[in-house]
Amino acid sequence: GSSEREIVDLAQGDYEEMDQLAMARPFCKAAYRLTYAQDIGIAVARAIRSAISGRSGGVYLDIPGAMLDAAEGARSLVKVIEPAQRQIPAKSAIDRAIEVMKTAKRPLIVLGKGAAYDQCDDLIRELVEKSGYPFLPMSMAKGLLPDTHPQCAAAARSMVLKDSDVVIMMGARINWLLSHGKGKQWGEPGAKRFVQMDIEAEEMDSNVEIAAPIVGDVGSCCEALLKAMDGAGIAPPKEWLDAVNSKATANMAKMDARLRNNNDPMDYHGALGVIKDAINDHPDTILVNEGANTLDMCRSIVNIHKPRHRIDVGTWGVMGIGMGSAIAAAIETGKRVLAVEGDSAFGFCGMEVETVCRYNLPI
């Protein structure tokens, strides 16, 4: 429990005296403080709704220590009904997106972790395959479709980002992870048109102009687009698909030779080649990954075959969460977890290994 408010507010010197609510607010989606035990149930319900509705995020609930054993709190609990309701996109937004897609000569789909969080995997796969467009998964969207899928353009990432003319962002933000949609990575300025699906309207136009914004949850957006795509004439040109496949095949052949180098001492490529084979042989394994070079190279080398089976440092790039994430994944799923840690990142969380050993977790 947090420190007692009447002592903290007068700075009287309580044990671990700290205004935890004020400290949590800048870093959480929402932060609330309880004053009465009878409000525990409604406060927990509000925290759940805040955490998983709209764009999901962490919520801090400040509960003073005096309330932790209050019997009244248990009696106050409420059932949280539909905490994350669907957000249906406007028909005009879907129609506009189809018109933009019709103009595409070199289309690309970018899958983000928002699409993974939505857990509408079948709809996403249906839309990607029905469109025929090459797709590029961001790191925690890997596995929504297997990295071995014939439409996956991850091995031709530089080419498709630079040369595409219409880019469909599915639950992916155009932030630092994508160079804010600008610079050499994206080719000539103004040469691209973006279709963006996002549950938050404020995300649109955050870095570049969005030609067709679609506000809604990814599942509902996919359903609406799938219906509108029938007979719309949006098939990608064969020349574009052949060029992407040719580049991806050539890059994979070059990389494969480096992964089989068998150097002594072992280098990044040799180590990640072994890990890649292990994941391919055991695709149900959850991969946790953090670091700098370790993160970048592992993301591009190791295939992920199932949704939400890769956990990394996310948008903020915070180091030191890897082993904690591995523990959570093992406990929540019961699956085997493989943690690939950079040396510096492991330095922040290495003592978590003691917890792994104490509970004999499959990590």
Q: What spans do the regions from the language model cover?
A:
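N-terminal alpha/beta PP-like core and its mobile active-site loop of ThDP/TPP-dependent enzymes
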Residues: 1-236, 278, 336-338, 355, ...
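A general structural motif
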Residues: 9-14, 84-96, 266-267, 290-294, ...
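Internal, active-site/partner-interface "lid" segment
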Residues: 40, 235-252
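Short coil/turn segments at secondary-structure boundaries
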Residues: 60-62, 238-243, 288-291
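Short hydrophobic beta-strand segments
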Residues: 108-112, 286-289, 343
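Conserved short loop/turn motifs at secondary-structure junctions
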Residues: 112-116, 260-261, 265, 342-344
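Active-site diphosphate/adenylate-binding microenvironment
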Residues: 246-332
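Catalytic phosphate/nucleotide-handling subdomain of diverse soluble enzymes
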Residues: 321, 325-361
